[in-house]
Amino acid sequence: MKKILTLLVILNMFVSISMAAESDYRKIYLDMKVPDFSYIHGIDPGQYYDNKDASYSVYPLLRLSSPLYFKTITIKPGYYDLTPREHKGKQYILFKQNGLIVHILPVYKKEIVPIDFYRTHLPKPRYTITQKIGNSLHMFVGKVFKSAKRKPLAKTYLEVEDVADNFVILIIYYNNYRYYIIVRSVRM
């Protein structure tokens, strides 16, 4: 009987914690401010540095089929590169199209990515025989000549959670950190 009561008390604590988390979304959303800055000509100054070793954009790509809203900002349907940036000590996510910044949204939480997250969530690339031979040749050249060694690209992942009261949480994984953004699927 004591075990059952203890189990019920613990279960009740977890349920109350999850209910409190659901009700906090409105408070988090209302406490966040619309960014009051912009970049000159909509160009991200760190974009060249991030993409210099890659042949494609290293940022996670978000495809929207319906608009999202953050207070006065309307994010229209389309494709967006999501880029985390820091401005005056605060974290922001830049929504970019064609390399230009379209929207800037604040991050409400930044966490470190768990150690094995990318290994368990990202699929392993499958190579043909000729690609395997080419990769082993590149690895050999990289071992002999250190300057020719390929640098690993940024690891990225994107999660979208639809939570209570028309709130949507975007979780952007970029390298060692994950960034949380809260938006709405309907205007408030």
Protein language model regions, located:
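Sec-dependent N-terminal signal peptides
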Residues: I4-F14
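Sec/Tat signal peptide C-region and signal peptidase I cleavage site
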Residues: S16-A21
